[in-house]
């Protein structure tokens, strides 16, 4: 959201969700504030616009004390850029030094590397980092909640595999998860339960590689992904979801024909993707998450 305020222009970009957004919205409406959307990002923007204080740092700190939930923010004012992260550390946020001496802020380190950034650091939970005229200033606006609550789905699904979060590479985490899954399954089922391991692309590929390494079951591609189809699990009806899956994935029959197929996926909500194998030439299908 971008608005004009009594303190000057203000723009805010937000990754996350406030769980007390409705309560904060009602408080603002009782004060005469109007809204053009149902977004919690607009609520946060309006709170900053109405807050007193002599500096944007003070206004941000005051607002953070009222925000409950996940938020990684980039706030742009006339003279400064602020990187803000909630005290639980739900979502990632990082800062890099540009080759020309300026700074860039992004959710993922991969975006900063593309810009040629060096000296990349995470914005720590509860921090407000101000960037102005190549200078970087850090303020601990709220104490870090102990323990932190990093969203597990970042490592499993959301993040790009080249992302480094809290010093840990996402691809490495996913591969290790696949290895651990393989150990747990072989303890219960032995080692002779599959002929081929295939991932549901793309986020499950590292886990399938790790699973294959431990079980020594050959890894292969079983699905071809249409990269022009978006996420299907958020469609409003099951018929639309199934149609989306049919458009998004095609089975490579030659790689699964007459084989016991072990499918590795990051999560199973309704099983629509793995159901495609039942109409293929696979002899048997087993799903592991």
Task: Please report, for each region that a protein language model flagged, where it lies by residue.
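Extended, hydrophobic alpha-helical segments in both membrane/secreted and soluble proteins
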Residues: 197, 205-211, 219, 260-277
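Conserved small/polar residues in nucleotide/adenosyl-binding loops
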Residues: 278-285
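ATP-dependent adenylate-handling active sites, centered on carboxylate activation for C-N bond formation
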Residues: 185-187, 256-260, 276
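A glycine-rich phosphate-binding loop feature that marks nucleotide/adenosyl-phosphate handling sites
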Residues: 195-206, 227-229
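Short, glycine/charge-rich flexible loops or terminal/linker lids adjacent to PRPP-binding catalytic cores
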Residues: 214-262, 272
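Structured, non-catalytic alpha/beta "coupling" segments that mediate domain-domain communication
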Residues: 125-127, 208-214
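Conserved short alpha-helical segments that host acidic/polar catalytic motifs at enzyme active sites
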Residues: 1-125, 130-195, 200
């Amino acid at each position: 959201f971008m608005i004009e305020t009594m303190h000057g222009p203000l723009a805010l970009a937000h990754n996350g969700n406030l769980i007390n957004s409705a309560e904060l919205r009602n408080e603002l409406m009782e004060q005469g504030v109007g809204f053009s959307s149902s977004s919690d990002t607009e609520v946060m923007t309006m709170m900053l616009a109405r807050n007193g204080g002599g500096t944007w740092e003070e206004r941000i700190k005051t607002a953070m004390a009222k925000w409950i939930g996940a938020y990684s923010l980039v706030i742009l004012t006339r003279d400064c850029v602020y990187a803000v992260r909630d005290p639980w550390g739900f979502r990632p946020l990082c800062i890099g030094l540009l080759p020309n001496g300026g700074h860039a802020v992004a959710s993922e380190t991969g975006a900063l590397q593309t810009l040629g950034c060096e000296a990349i650091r995470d914005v720590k939970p509860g921090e407000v980092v101000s960037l102005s005229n190549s200078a970087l200033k850090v303020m601990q606006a709220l104490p870090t909640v102990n323990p932190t609550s990093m969203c597990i789905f970042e490592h499993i699904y959301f993040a790009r595999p080249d992302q480094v979060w809290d010093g840990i590479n996402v691809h490495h985490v996913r591969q290790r998860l696949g290895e651990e899954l393989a150990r747990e399954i072989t303890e219960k089922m032995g080692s002779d339960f599959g002929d081929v391991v295939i991932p549901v692309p793309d986020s499950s590929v590292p886990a399938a590689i790790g699973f294959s390494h431990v079980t020594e079951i050959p890894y292969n591609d079983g699905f071809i992904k249409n990269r022009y189809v978006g996420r299907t699990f958020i469609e409003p009806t099951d018929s639309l979801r199934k149609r989306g899956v049919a458009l998004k994935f095609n089975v490579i029959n030659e790689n699964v024909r007459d084989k016991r197929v072990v499918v590795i996926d990051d999560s199973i909500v309704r099983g629509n993707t793995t159901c495609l194998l039942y109409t293929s030439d696979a002899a048997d299908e087993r799903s592991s998450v």
